[in-house]
């Protein structure tokens, strides 16, 4: 259950990052509210996951999901540039996440 909570927490990190971008410096009410609700839920699920997962594993996976997810949303939704170096960086992050998962005791 901790891994499911951690995965959802990571996805919610992507949601709040995207909503924050849409909030235009917190000047637009709906994206601002979505940002803070998603942050609250993301942190809550991360805290739940940390009850049974090691700190380093949980935090690394959470930030990794957020980083790669924001990268993908930036490209797919916002039309950000795709370069070989950026894609390689995302692949390395995902590789690290897989290694953290397979080496975790929980």
How should these model regions be labeled?
Residues 1-106:
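Polytopic alpha-helical membrane proteins, predominantly small-molecule transporters/carriers
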């Amino acid at each position: 259950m901790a891994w499911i909570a951690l995965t959802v927490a990571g996805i919610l990190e992507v949601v709040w990052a995207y909503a924050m971008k849409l909030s235009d410096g917190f000047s637009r009410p709906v994206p601002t509210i979505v940002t803070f609700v998603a942050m609250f839920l993301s942190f809550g699920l991360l805290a739940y996951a940390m009850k049974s997962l090691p700190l380093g594993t949980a935090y690394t996976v959470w930030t990794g999901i957020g980083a790669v997810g924001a990268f993908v949303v930036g490209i797919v939704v916002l039309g950000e540039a795709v370069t070989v170096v950026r894609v390689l960086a995302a692949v390395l992050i995902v590789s690290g996440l897989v290694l953290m998962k397979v080496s975790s005791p929980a």
